[in-house]
Amino acid sequence: MLVLASASPRRREILSRFIREFQIIPSSASEECSIADPREHALELARRKAREVYERLGKKATVIGADTVVSIGGKILGKPGNEEEAFRMLKTLSGRMHLVTTGYCIIHRGEEHCGAVVTEVKFRELDEDLIWAYIRTGEPMDKAGAYGIQGKGGLFVEWIRGDYYNVVGFPIEIIWKLKELGFDVLSR
């Protein structure tokens, strides 16, 4: 049995493109983390999520945990707590390059297979009216860095260097790792 330890509809949608059958069991692990390094922060939270669900299921499943963070100048931008915070985040990203890092942990037959994927994203210059119009859509409120590249937030992106799916929150490297672990990732 394969389990995705996430309630994210974006992660579910990407995984379903490659794996026909899996279960979704969101992790209840704490997402409080004082690790400042974006890569280590994302890896720690991914491990926590995977381990919590793996233990809850009695160590009888393959479990995928993932966590995505946006960072700029080494500072992590999480999910905005309110519209003003979303505005500040988007204003900070405006006209600048930032990093999107997804840490993942797959627990398969008792062994942890963990990694992190980093994608560079460059935003266009954004004026305040455009930022507020985007915030009013509600789209940025549940996303790290206050934007979703797969939605209206994609308008802000000038270029990316790396894995697009990583920016969405579920890098293709996870699918490749599942293939290496023996999962059929191409049958439908």
Swiss-Prot record:
<dbReference type="Pfam" id="PF02545">
    <property type="entry name" value="Maf"/>
</dbReference>
<feature type="site" description="Important for substrate specificity">
    <location>
        <position position="68"/>
    </location>
</feature>
<keyword id="KW-0546">Nucleotide metabolism</keyword>
<dbReference type="GO" id="GO:0005737">
    <property type="term" value="C:cytoplasm"/>
</dbReference>
<protein>
    <recommendedName>
        <fullName>dTTP/UTP pyrophosphatase</fullName>
        <ecNumber>3.6.1.9</ecNumber>
    </recommendedName>
</protein>
<comment type="similarity">
    <text>Belongs to the Maf family. YhdE subfamily.</text>
</comment>
<dbReference type="GO" id="GO:0036221">
    <property type="term" value="F:UTP diphosphatase activity"/>
</dbReference>
<feature type="site" description="Important for substrate specificity">
    <location>
        <position position="150"/>
    </location>
</feature>
<dbReference type="GO" id="GO:0047429">
    <property type="term" value="F:nucleoside triphosphate diphosphatase activity"/>
</dbReference>
<dbReference type="InterPro" id="IPR029001">
    <property type="entry name" value="ITPase-like_fam"/>
</dbReference>
<keyword id="KW-0963">Cytoplasm</keyword>
<keyword id="KW-0378">Hydrolase</keyword>
<comment type="function">
    <text>Nucleoside triphosphate pyrophosphatase that hydrolyzes dTTP and UTP. May have a dual role in cell division arrest and in preventing the incorporation of modified nucleotides into cellular nucleic acids.</text>
</comment>
<feature type="site" description="Important for substrate specificity">
    <location>
        <position position="10"/>
    </location>
</feature>
<feature type="active site" description="Proton acceptor">
    <location>
        <position position="67"/>
    </location>
</feature>
<dbReference type="GO" id="GO:0009117">
    <property type="term" value="P:nucleotide metabolic process"/>
</dbReference>
<dbReference type="GO" id="GO:0036218">
    <property type="term" value="F:dTTP diphosphatase activity"/>
</dbReference>
<dbReference type="InterPro" id="IPR003697">
    <property type="entry name" value="Maf-like"/>
</dbReference>
